[in-house]
Regions:
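Interfacial helix-loop-helix linkers and transmembrane-helix boundary segments
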Residues: 53, 71-79
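Transmembrane alpha-helix interface motif
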Residues: 1-51, 56-66, 171-267
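Membrane-helix interfacial "entry" motifs
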Residues: 21, 25, 69-74, 103, ...
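Juxtamembrane/interface alpha-helical elements of multi-pass membrane proteins
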Residues: 78-185
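Membrane-helix interface segments
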Residues: 50, 71-72, 152-154
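Short helix-capping/hinge motifs at transmembrane helix termini and TM-loop junctions
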Residues: 47, 68-69, 96-97, 138, ...
């Protein structure tokens, strides 16, 4: 199995995760989408020096991982490429903000270090929330919920087609990579001199495949918009989940939970 086939397998694993059964999976897609958006907004609203305040925001993703039955290690494995890029956002903060902000065990910690850690946690928490949304909601249901929320149909169509076509492109890349290695056995990767023709062939194959897909869509009744499957109505448990989640986020945002718990333990 080459790298492209492994990537295709990981894409299918996301669909398998979304097809599982759990209380989180059974919630209305709109409730999960809105709660995720609220979580991300409130998470990024923390001050760059409020490291102690943002740590309790980890409680919500951890709780959802436990209820949904999705292992936390699966999340970090799927995000292994994106996580280093997100965590590198504040990597240079310690060099620009060197003023001491607090003392930790007799060691002065600069504001740049604190802001770097805060930015890293913000990125990690937001990625975890986004992964949970995708891992517990099928893409078709998510797109149907977006249309229910009056998101422009063109944007929803682009999202769905992009998600689906990534798998198609990965499949084409897997076939081309296998063909290349059969013609160049024992060679690691694709030689620099072959990249021009390789990318040209990929472009031609993707254009042909896109024409075939579009013709198939027209034969199945596609006319500028998709006919999404009906999703169940928004029920009381969905509303309670959404309301409870937002109230929980506001509690973590407005109340210094770390200081409150610290005061209880000190007593």
């Amino acid at each position: 199995m080459n790298k492209m086939e492994k990537a295709l397998h990981e894409l299918s694993e996301m669909d398998d995760l979304a097809a599982q059964e759990s209380p989180i999976h059974r919630l209305h897609p709109a409730a999960k989408l809105l709660s995720t958006i609220a979580y991300i907004i409130l998470t990024v609203s923390f001050d760059k020096y409020d490291l102690a305040g943002i740590v309790p925001m980890l409680l919500w993703p951890v709780l959802l991982f436990q209820i949904s039955g999705i292992p936390v290690r699966t999340c970090f494995y799927k995000l292994r490429i994106v996580l280093p890029l997100v965590m590198a956002v504040g990597l240079f903060n310690p060099f620009f903000d060197r003023a001491p902000l607090l003392m930790l065990g007799g060691v002065a910690v600069s504001g740049g270090v604190v802001s770097m850690l805060t930015l890293m946690l913000k990125g990690v928490f937001c990625l975890m929330a986004s992964f949970l949304l995708m891992a517990t909601t099928p893409i078709d249901s998510l797109c149907a919920a977006l249309r229910r929320l009056h998101v422009p149909g063109m944007l929803v169509t682009l999202l769905l087609l992009t998600y689906r076509y990534v798998g198609v492109m990965t499949e084409e890349l897997a076939v081309m990579t296998d063909a290349y290695h059969l013609r160049a056995p024992g060679q690691k990767g694709i030689h620099m001199s072959a990249w021009g023709s390789f990318l040209g062939q990929l472009l031609l194959r993707s254009m042909d495949r896109a024409q075939e897909l579009y013709a198939s869509m027209l034969l199945r009744g596609y006319h500028d918009h998709f006919h999404y499957a009906d999703i169940r109505p928004f029920r009381l448990p969905d509303g309670l989940y959404l309301l409870g989640s937002v109230l929980f986020f506001l509690l973590l945002r407005l109340v210094d939970v770390a200081q409150l718990l610290g005061g209880l333990f000190v007593r």
